[in-house]
Amino acid sequence: MYDLTGKHVCYVADCGGIALETSKVLMTKNIAKLAILQSVENPPAIAQLQSIKHSTQIFFWTFDVTMAREEMKKYFDEVMVQMDYIDVLINGATLCDERNIDATINTNLTGMMNTVATVLPYMDRKMGGSGGLIVNVTSVIGLDPSPVFCAYSASKFGVIGFTRSLADPLYFTQNGVAVMAVCCGPTKVFVDRELTAFLAYGQSFADRLRRAPCQSTAVCGQNIVNAIERSENGQIWIADKGGLESVALHWYWHMADQFVNYMQSTDDEDQEFFLGQR
């Protein structure tokens, strides 16, 4: 179990919906500090969080996840002055706008990757950090395709690929930073929005989704924290229908293991074996 007591948590997401409900649960776990970076100010939400645990220090920054990495660095330099260090980074910024592919990809994938690249040096054990945990909050349609939300699904598939790649022992054994993802199923805060399909053929399905059964935002937030507490490096979770399920990961490329061994090996025989198999 990952013990959140005394931890310094940084949450990059709008403090509403899933992020707010997740933060509420985090505040019951005796964390020491919570930094919230979001696109708009939400003083009532911050006050609500503070009322749960007065001793937890909460810091807030207005933050655009799509900004350039150089600009992000300036923000996180300020964050570190207040936080001292980051134990847990949660990436939860999300956008589903099939009419604006660039914004969807930049928010869900590019922005998340830039955030991780910016924060990792502060956490990296070999760079003076203490290691820690990165949590990427994503969607079940990052595991299975969506014929309705094609751009959104593509961005979420990217999150899973990035998470699994960064969790490789090649990195984890060096920097001490575990990486995991939580894939949320249909959640009330999402389906209550006006949703537009990638192509007009799918719009009737998008409209129908608003009437479909879904999990409450509060339950989803609770299960995100449950996943964090049960986390292992590289683990992917599904938080759906009020439950939490670990995903069985597979290698589909038949040469994957040999390729990794080839890349990591200094033994000429291992390298010759891989090249011979091709």
Curated annotation (Swiss-Prot):
Organism of this sequence: Drosophila pseudoobscura pseudoobscura (Fruit fly)
Alphabetic keyword roster: Oxidoreductase
Gene3D superfamilies recorded: NAD(P)-binding Rossmann-like Domain
Transmembrane region(s): none
Leader peptide range in chain numbering: none
Binding site for NAD(+): 11-34
Active site, renumbered: Y152
Family of this protein: Belongs to the short-chain dehydrogenases/reductases (SDR) family.
Keyword check for Protease: no
A GO cellular component annotation in the UniProt record: cytoplasm
Gene Ontology molecular function, alphabetical: oxidoreductase activity
Protein name, per record: Alcohol dehydrogenase-related 31 kDa protein
Residues that bind substrate: S139
The encoding gene: Adhr
